Amino acid sequence: MASQGTKRSYEQMETDGERQNANEIRASVGKMIGGIGRFYIQMCTELKLSDYEGRLIQNSLTIERMVLSAFDERRNKYLEEHPSAGKDPKKTGGPIYKRVDGKWMRELVLYDKEEIRRIWRQANNGDDATAGLTHMMIWHSNLNDTTYQRTRALVRTGMDPRMCSLMQGSTLPRRSGAAGAAVKGVGTMVMELIRMIKRGINDRNFWRGENGRKTRNAYERMCNILKGKFQTAAQRAMMDQVRESRNPGNAEIEDLIFLARSALILRGSVAHKSCLPACVYGPAVASGYDFEKEGYSLVGIDPFKLLQNSQVYSLIRPNENPAHKSQLVWMACNSAAFEDLRVSSFIRGTKVIPRGKLSTRGVQIASNENMDTMGSSTLELRSRYWAIRTRSGGNTNQQRASAGQISVQPTFSVQRNLPFDKPTIMAAFTGNAEGRTSDMRAEIIRMMEGAKPEEVSFQGRGVFELSDEKATNPIVPSFDMSNEGSYFFGDNAEEYDN
């Protein structure tokens, strides 16, 4: 990336930091993780959870959701102003699962948001610790990315369901800040912009008046975020054109869809962070580990080491396969929903299979599901190797396209080819004369046509033994070049419905 110098590292985004050196970053990320851990321990005490119940991922999700809801200023204000039946705007809660007489029971808990905010601040030295909240949002987003396919959302905005590899972070809330923007895929940003433009087309006042100015600022900011993800001059120039449009309409929507398609080959840079559930950080803090003193990174060996030594449990429905449930959560923890399955399998040390072949539903349990038949099992979240997370998108050469399979956005910096079905992708570009024909379009198509599926990305980069903390001896895996591995291919995953 040419503009690397002006960019803050994720860890800086994660902690709202000014420029910091590596140790300061590790310390501030560690501080954030420690705060989440302390909060989780306190909540387990409040809820009188046993050690086993505290390590249950479903309980972790409920507790995380409670604190996110307690700090959701906008929604809280909205709930105050639009009281709805049966919803107390001042309270938050959810299902907590406990083991009673050899059976799992569901208990609905309700807490004052004020009380939850107090516990959170207390665990974070009196601060609001927004970075920690964002971290939990990204963990939820990564879990959603792994669990659901966004076909319906893609089709609604006029995009192709095969573009699902561009949809990282599509369920992140708007308030997830710079760290959230960094992990959003090209398709996610395009979808947000298209929704905005459509509102403008349907509502005459959307861009007008005092509010319209704010809307316009948000539009241009989102355009700049998306522009920053593209790595070729032509794609960036097209984004300038979309941003500067006086009155965004269908031409801009067409341009954005064109750009999203182009990102299947000319991949954008999208950050990947290993965000783990709070029930992993809690026990680590409880055992006396000092994250701030030791330092922590979301993109190095630390999350792998932490998962290596963690016990996490999950509720299992009668006909679910515990190994498949483990894979789902492993992928979410490593932010690997859109990674090539060949690479994930190598790192994990067990075969990672496509979503459609998994016998498991999501991690969350609906309130109407029968608890009598519910079992639980240990999630296997360990890995054979570790690898550095990337945000380059794996293009082989900065200004040139590299082969991008129709469904991969690399997570790990590991050498591989990125096979893709070029005829399928290129077919999407023929005869689409809507929008504008321009030199930029021609240039983008030319670069895509030049891409070769057999080119190698991340040349010389490999995985590391877990004992190799300083990443000194890369092990470069060799993959079957013809056999691409995309997770959502030929798939029947559930849809994500808010």
From Swiss-Prot:
Keywords: Capsid protein, Helical capsid protein, Host nucleus, Host-virus interaction, Ribonucleoprotein, RNA-binding, Viral nucleoprotein, Viral penetration into host nucleus, Virion, Virus entry into host cell
Post-translational changes noted in the entry: Late in virus-infected cells, may be cleaved from a 56-kDa protein to a 53-kDa protein by a cellular caspase. This cleavage might be a marker for the onset of apoptosis in infected cells or have a specific function in virus host interaction.
Keyword NAD in annotation: no
Assembly notes: Homomultimerizes to form the nucleocapsid. May bind host exportin-1/XPO1. Binds to viral genomic RNA. Protein-RNA contacts are mediated by a combination of electrostatic interactions between positively charged residues and the phosphate backbone and planar interactions between aromatic side chains and bases.
Source organism: Influenza A virus (strain A/Ann Arbor/6/1960 H2N2)
InterPro entries: Flu_NP
Entry's Gene Ontology molecular function annotations: RNA binding; structural molecule activity
Compositionally biased intervals (Basic and acidic residues): 8-21
GO biological process: symbiont entry into host cell; viral penetration into host nucleus
Localization in the cell: Virion; Host nucleus
A Gene Ontology cellular-component term: ribonucleoprotein complex
Alphabetized Pfam families for the sequence: Flu_NP
Effect recorded for N23T: In cold-adapted isolate
Sequence motif Bipartite nuclear localization signal, residues: 198-216
Region spans: Disordered: 1-22
Family: Belongs to the influenza viruses nucleoprotein family.
Disulphide-bridged cysteine pairs: none
Gene: NP
Effect listed in the UniProt record for changing G34D: In cold-adapted isolate
UniProt main location, coarse: virion
Function comment: Encapsidates the negative strand viral RNA, protecting it from nucleases. The encapsidated genomic RNA is termed the ribonucleoprotein (RNP) and serves as template for transcription and replication. The RNP needs to be localized in the host nucleus to start an infectious cycle, but is too large to diffuse through the nuclear pore complex. NP comprises at least 2 nuclear localization signals that are responsible for the active RNP import into the nucleus through cellular importin alpha/beta pathway.
This protein's record includes keyword RNA-binding: yes
Superkingdom, natural source: Viruses
Motif (Unconventional nuclear localization signal): 1-18
Name used for this protein in its record: Nucleoprotein
